[in-house]
């Protein structure tokens, strides 16, 4: 499975083309729109989310509610584009119109300045538009399709916030993936402990009032994953490495860990490794899951536990100092529409990219033209593992 996305933040639309989805997967626009709505939710989102009510258009690869095995084309219209017709015009326009929303005061922490230097732009909006997190709309849409496939083969996925700014959320022990999904969806800040809800909302309000932003840590959990996805044979076939790349590719993500992650660097081996046991009903199991479901770059049958850290959104309503690229004089950075935090939305994106990587790996191991063959292949493999 592979995909390509295209589109600018204030352009006419966002587009994705996906290749490699097996035929026979039940799929409708509603399945995708549900996740697009989740991405637009969450406490602390800004005015852009009030303008855009994302709805996907499926224009190829699906007929009568089922995939055809051919490339799938997805499009999401940017409703806000109607206010940007001149600024985002494909055709050349008058110089005075170009100057209306020209960006020449790059924002620290964004792609503005480096992108402008790399591609020789005199208007940094050219970098801003594509580097915007608006692009993640399409990765969520793609992830929604991936999650449909995972569900068909008994794999479920969920996410929740474990750190909001500097506030760590206490997570109840031994929650299932389904329980995490339900609790997180019931929270406006995507947490699983309701006792922290109001505290986090108040914190977001105070940060917004101060013209500042906050980041945090998001945890994604995947259950029902077969043993042996990924490989130890080559560096670029390790599945945890692929997931790490996908997570850090999300806008504003600066780090990733699995299981105990960086904490394992402070412990002894006897405190970190997961003891192995065997039962007639379950086969091989681990007595703990400190390694987050991976050994040797391969899934070991335990739930995948991966966390990503998101830096605070760089656009500040009380902007930091920058430089005017025309005069090189000090100047306050440009202010674009932004949010005090986008952690709940980022969790939906993280869930989507992890699901997409997993489906790509599943389809590589269990190469199938249609969903019937895929489900049979996975079923046969699970039976083999249970009797190993």
UniProtKB/Swiss-Prot annotation:
**Its biological purpose:** This reaction introduces a second double bond into the aromatic ring system.
Pfam assignment, any one: Chorismate_synt
What protein name is recorded for this chain?
Answer: Chorismate synthase
Q: Which SUPFAM superfamilies match?
A: Chorismate synthase, AroC (SSF103263)
> Which gene is annotated as encoding this protein in its UniProt record?
aroC
User: Do the record's keywords include Lyase?
Assistant: yes
Assigned GO CC terms: cytosol
Sorted alphabetically, which Gene3D superfamilies does this protein's record hold? Chorismate synthase AroC
Q: Tell me what organism the protein belongs to.
A: Streptococcus agalactiae serotype III (strain NEM316)
- Family the UniProt entry places it in: Belongs to the chorismate synthase family.
How are cofactors bound according to the entry's free-text note?
Reduced FMN (FMNH(2)).
């Amino acid at each position: 499975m592979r995909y390509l996305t295209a589109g600018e933040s204030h352009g006419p639309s966002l587009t994705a083309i996906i290749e490699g989805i097996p035929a026979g997967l039940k799929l409708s626009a509603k399945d995708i729109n549900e996740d697009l709505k989740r991405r637009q939710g969450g406490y602390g989102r800004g005015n852009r989310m009030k303008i855009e009510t994302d709805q996907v258009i499926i224009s190829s690869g699906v007929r009568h509610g089922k995939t055809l095995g051919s490339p799938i084309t997805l499009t999401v219209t940017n409703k806000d584009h109607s206010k940007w017709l001149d600024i985002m015009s494909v055709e050349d326009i008058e110089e005075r119109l170009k100057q209306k929303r020209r960006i020449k005061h790059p924002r620290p922490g964004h792609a503005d300045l480096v992108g402008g230097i790399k591609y020789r732009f005199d208007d940094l909006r050219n970098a801003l538009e594509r580097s915007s997190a608006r692009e993640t709309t399409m990765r969520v849409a793609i992830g929604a399709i991936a999650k449909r496939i995972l569900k068909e083969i008994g794999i479920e996925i969920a996410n929740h916030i474990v750190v909001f700014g500097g506030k760590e959320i206490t997570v109840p022990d031994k929650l299932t993936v389904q329980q995490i999904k339900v609790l997180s969806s019931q929270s406006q800040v995507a947490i699983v402990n309701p006792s922290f809800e109001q505290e986090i909302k108040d914190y977001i309000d105070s940060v917004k009032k101060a013209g500042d932003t906050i980041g945090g840590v998001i945890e994604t959990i995947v259950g029902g994953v077969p043993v042996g996805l990924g490989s130890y044979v080559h560096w670029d076939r390790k599945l945890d490495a692929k997931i790490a790349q996908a997570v850090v590719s999300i806008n504003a993500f600066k780090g990733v860990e699995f299981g105990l992650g960086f904490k394992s660097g402070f412990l002894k081996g006897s405190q970190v490794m997961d003891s192995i046991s065997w039962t007639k009903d379950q086969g091989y199991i681990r007595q703990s899951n400190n390694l987050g479901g991976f050994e040797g770059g391969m899934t070991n049958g335990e739930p995948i536990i991966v966390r990503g850290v998101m830096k605070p959104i760089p656009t500040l309503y009380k902007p930091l100092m920058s430089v005017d690229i025309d005069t090189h004089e000090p100047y306050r950075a440009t202010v674009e529409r932004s949010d005090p935090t986008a952690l709940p939305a980022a969790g939906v994106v993280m869930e989507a990219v992890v699901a997409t990587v997993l489906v790509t790996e599943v389809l590589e191991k269990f190469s199938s033209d249609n969903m019937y063959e895929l489900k049979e292949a996975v079923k046969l493999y699970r039976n083999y593992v249970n009797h190993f």
